[in-house]
Swiss-Prot record:
GO terms for molecular function: DNA binding; excinuclease ABC activity. The lineage of its organism: Bacteria, Bacillati, Bacillota, Bacilli, Bacillales. The gene is uvrC. This is UvrABC system protein C. Interacts with UvrB in an incision complex. SUPFAM superfamilies: C-terminal UvrC-binding domain of UvrB, GIY-YIG endonuclease, RuvA domain 2-like. Gene3D superfamilies: 5' to 3' exonuclease, C-terminal subdomain, GIY-YIG endonuclease, UVR domain, UvrC, RNAse H endonuclease domain.
Length: 594
């Protein structure tokens, strides 16, 4: 531990507050809160930790803290600091998980819609629904029963919905505010749990129509009742009080936390939310951070009641969220909390099982690949691929797989320097020479297997450099593609012999991943360089544009297309003098063929 950290720890206060961990660049990498700052911060630098926490601690070179008057104030401050600094070790719940709602618009002639965006627009929103199908089924039923307008824009004549009895045709007929209000009130009653009452009313109307020998009408009403029964059958009642509540449960294992939320609406369990993330604090602190971020998500309405596990300070949750929070000791609510806890525990167990299974498969694939090639297990594999289009900007890329997984910090990109024109073999010789000359000089780890994306010529070129120039004898294989440019087989040895792998084997899938990854990495690098050169060559003939201004324009606009669409003012904003901006604008707008 750095000496100045020890000094800071010694004077840290015994009070609640937030702490900000910083790396050597002074960047905030983690924000936490504590009831007692001194104890919490010290805990990071004492005792044993799991791998994730050790990585965090390994990056900490400084910290600061903010004292608060209460744990509640610390919780609020923590959320604001996380939003401000976006530290890489903090969880940041994304707003990408949204649920569908049924909306009654506030238009003069209201409509029923399904939306995932809840706005403050005077519309009435009902939900969330567990999925789009459930929302669409409910809306379809309401459309059949209640004749609000269906068209987005008012047509000039009545549509099919009018003839089906599902619209009052406000496009050509007068529909009063009172008529619409009556329909809207019925829909609201239905969506607020009054479907049984609506069903009873429809049943009475069905019998009345039957007695009047209005059999078509009776059949329509019977079908509506059947639709209600079918939809409500999918939404079984689990609570009789019809209160909207969110029930939380969580589990912690191997430095990870899983939180499960059950959404109970009008007595029905309609959906659950599952979140998994690494945790560096005590579980209770991690849960409080999660729940604060959870309700900042615009798709998560605060219900009337929040139910939390017994280990959580429900009074703090209640004051923080300004919603009734309960900690049940018995009964149905406690059963639901325990069910959420159980689901969270199972989800974590499944996560670790899948990780272990995938690791086992990957290690076996690496081992089997070595046996197929007649070499020792290739724990470290390095693969090379060249990329050029019509001989321009030739590049090469190297990727590394360690224990069958991509090690992206080991990836390398190369601009071809000594080869003129499109010569794949000489390009491969140059890159292999540069890569392993440097590896020897820096005493870097050498691979157990080198894979060259290419045939016999590529393999011969790379082997010549490796063995005859550098004196290295590392197993090397060529990765041959079929006529569809897909992975076909390997070649190895001198002379090269084909090694055919089972196409459904794990080692074949491993080779496919390696080939796809090295090709992706090479082509991405090539496109970056090609894009830059196109811009620079297009600017070569413009007076007043040298290398420095080319770089500025490239950085600001990113592409020639954006430059051609830019105004004079935008070139000035990019740092060009007014007269130069006018010259660039005139030149690019005149050169239509660029």
């Amino acid at each position: 531990m750095h000496e100045h950290l020890k000094e800071k720890l010694a004077i840290s206060p015994d009070q609640p507050g937030c702490y900000l961990m910083k790396d050597k660049q002074g960047t905030v990498i983690y924000v936490g809160k504590a009831k007692v700052l001194k104890n919490r911060v010290r805990s990071y630098f004492t005792g044993s930790h799991d791998g994730k926490t050790l990585r965090l601690v390994g990056e900490i070179v400084d910290f600061e803290y903010i004292v608060t008057s209460s744990n509640l104030e610390a919780l609020i401050l923590e959320l604001n600091l996380i939003k401000k600094y976006d530290p890489k070790y903090n969880i940041q719940l994304k707003d990408d998980k949204t649920y569908p709602f049924i909306k009654i618009t506030a238009e003069k002639q209201p409509r029923l819609l399904i939306t995932r965006n809840v706005k403050k627009d005077k519309g009435k929103y009902f939900g969330p629904y567990p999925n789009a199908q459930s929302a669409h089924e409910t809306k379809k039923l309401l459309d059949r029963m209640y004749p609000l307008r269906k068209c987005t824009n008012m047509p000039d004549k009545v549509c099919l919905y009018y003839h089906m009895g599902q619209c009052l045709a406000p496009c050509v007929k007068e529909v009063t505010e009172e008529q619409n209000k009556e329909i809207v009130d019925e829909i609201i009653k239905f969506l607020n749990g009054g479907h049984k009452e609506v069903r009873s009313e429809l049943e009475i109307k069905m019998y009345e129509a039957s007695e009047k020998l209005e059999f078509e009408r009776a059949k329509e009403l019977r079908d509506q009742i059947a639709h209600i029964d079918a939809i409500m059958e999918k939404q079984k009642m689990i609570m009789s009080d019809l209160v909207d509540r969110d029930v939380f449960g969580y589990a912690v294992d191997k430095g990870w936390m899983c939180v499960q939320v059950f959404f109970v609406r009008k007595g029905k369990l309609i959906e659950r939310d599952v979140s998994m993330f690494p945790i560096y604090d005590e579980p209770e602190e991690g849960f409080l951070t999660f729940i604060g971020q959870f309700y900042e998500n615009s798709s998560h309405f605060k219900p009337k009641e929040i139910v939390v596990p017994g280990s959580i300070d429900s009074e703090l949750v209640e004051r923080f969220l300004e919603v009734e929070a309960t900690q049940p000791k018995r009964g149905k609510k406690k059963d639901l909390v325990e069910l959420a806890n159980k689901n969270a525990k199972i989800a974590l167990e499944e996560k670790f099982y899948l990780i272990e299974r995938d690791e086992e498969r990957t290690i076996k694939a690496v081992d089997h690949l070595g046996k197929q090639l007649g070499i020792e297990t290739p724990y470290r594999i390095e693969a090379f691929d060249n990329s050029n289009i019509q001989g321009t900007n030739p590049v090469s890329a190297m990727i590394a797989f360690i224990d069958g997984k991509p090690a992206k910090k080991e990836y390398r990109k190369y601009k071809i320097k000594t080869v003129q024109g499109p010569d794949d073999y000489e390009s491969m010789r140059e890159v292999v020479r540069r890569r392993y000359t440097r590896a020897l000089k820096e005493n870097s780890p050498l691979p157990d297997l080198i894979i060259i994306d290419g045939g016999k010529g590529h393999l011969a070129a790379a082997s010549d450099i490796l063995e005859n120039e550098l004196g290295l004898y590392i197993p090397m294989a060529g990765l041959v593609k079929d006529d569809k440019h897909k992975t076909s087989h390997l070649i190895i040895g001198d002379p090269p012999e084909p090694v055919m792998l089972e196409r459904n084997s794990q080692e074949f899938y491993l080779l496919q991943r390696i080939q796809d990854e090295v090709h992706r990495f090479a082509i991405t690098f090539h496109r970056q360089l090609h894009g830059k050169s196109v811009i620079q060559s297009a600017l070569d003939d413009i007076p007043g544009i040298g290398d420095k201004r080319k770089k500025v324009l490239l950085k600001h606009f990113g592409s020639l297309k954006k430059m051609k669409e830019a105004s004079i003012e935008e070139f000035v904003e990019a740092g060009m003098p007014k007269n130069v901006a006018e010259t660039i604008y005139t030149y690019l707008t005149d050169k239509k063929t660029l």
